[in-house]
Structures are given as structure tokens and as C-alpha cells.
């Protein structure tokens, strides 16, 4: 089984045609070590030292030099619109307060479908529409850099933060 050993981000891709591609949903694009079946039926192993988030158009570089293109799957989402920019900000706050993954744009927000959240958002005056689209939510504050693993107390000191 060939191994994916590097990532080329979509904005760095040169016009070479990929050897194959794989379609992954948002949750499947967060990985560290995982066997993946390509569109052509071949299995590869994504094997990275740290967890990575793959975006639409990124490429995995295999240990034999081939490039595999990542395609984000279309998912069942809600498109959420508010009355004005302030209302959108308030809706984003309520979504974030519930720790939901959200793709936030200038005039709308996308989240995965959840009927309880839909009722809440409509109760707050949002217009909520069912859509099927690629979902690229914002990454959280802990997605890079200094991370706390929540299996321990935070009652410790960081010399570089004092």
C-alpha cells in the first residue's frame, strides 16, 4: 500500500493532472493516519506526524511521487441568513455558543442540518434554507499552534505567556 507523505495545498498546485482523486466529507478531511480508498479502487495510507485538515483542491503526495486530489463532498446543510450584518453576527454567536462547525460568509452562514438548531435559529428571526453544498467550516481556536489536551488541569504555568 502506498503512503501519502506530504500535502500540496490547493493554492500551490501546479497544473499537473492528478493520478486519481478522493471525495471526502468535512469530518473525513480531518485525519492523521487513515486508510483511504481512491476513486479507482486503490487503497493508500495517509500517514502524517500530526493531524491535518484537507481542503477542496489540496493534493496528497504519495511515496511514489503521484498526486491524489482531494475533493470535498457535497453535504446536507442549512444556509442561514439574517436581516442585516448585526443580526448575522448575533446568529453566528448563538451557533458558536453551541460549538457547532460553521462556514461564515459575509451575508450567510452554513451549518450541518440539525432540526433542533433550525427551530432555534428561526425563533431568533433567521431565514433557514436547506441546501446541498461543499462544507468548509472555520477551524477552531485549537486547530493549530499551542493546543491544550483536555485530559488534564489547566492550573499550570506557561513561561512564554506570563
Swiss-Prot record:
It is found in: Cytoplasm. GO terms for cellular component: cytoplasm. It comes from the Bacteria. One of its GO terms (biological process) is protein-containing complex assembly. Disruption phenotype: Disrupting the ure1 operon causes loss of urease activity, decreased resistance to low pH killing in vitro and decreased pathogen survival when inoculated in BALB/c mice by gavage. This is Urease accessory protein UreE 1. Residues 152-162 have a biased composition (Basic and acidic residues). SMART domains: UreE_N. Belongs to the UreE family. InterPro entries: UreE, UreE_C_dom, UreE_N, UreE_N_sf. Keywords: Chaperone, Cytoplasm, Nickel, Nickel insertion, Virulence. Involved in urease metallocenter assembly. Binds nickel. Probably functions as a nickel donor during metallocenter assembly. GO terms for molecular function: nickel cation binding; unfolded protein binding. Pfam families: UreE_C, UreE_N. Its main location: cytoplasm. CDD domains: UreE (cd00571). Residues 143-162 are annotated as: Disordered.
